[in-house]
């Protein structure tokens, strides 16, 4: 996991052409965002997805409660994303905030491609 994280840091730094001042301000914001994002994913997993494993036993009342929770988590994610992009654009630029979105998608795609290539080669 640490290797992937360090590859991602290098990839994003290169794609955004962050200078040392920008990087010094950007990475703490990014790391905090990633942690909050993971917290929301863990919350969704533990409070919703685990319960869906036994969906045959799920009552309509419980399902409504889980659906409400799912919507609330998605709203929290959306607010987190908006606040993050605004903050990133302040310490870098609006253009770099947009480039970040592309860089993250490209990194994921490249990582999956690499995984499939290595898996197929074994």
What are the residue ranges of the model-derived segments?
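General structural signal for secondary-structure boundaries
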Residues: 1, 59-60, 117
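Amphipathic, charged alpha-helical segments and their helix-to-coil junctions
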Residues: 6-7, 15, 74-122
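Amphipathic alpha-helical segments
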Residues: 8-91
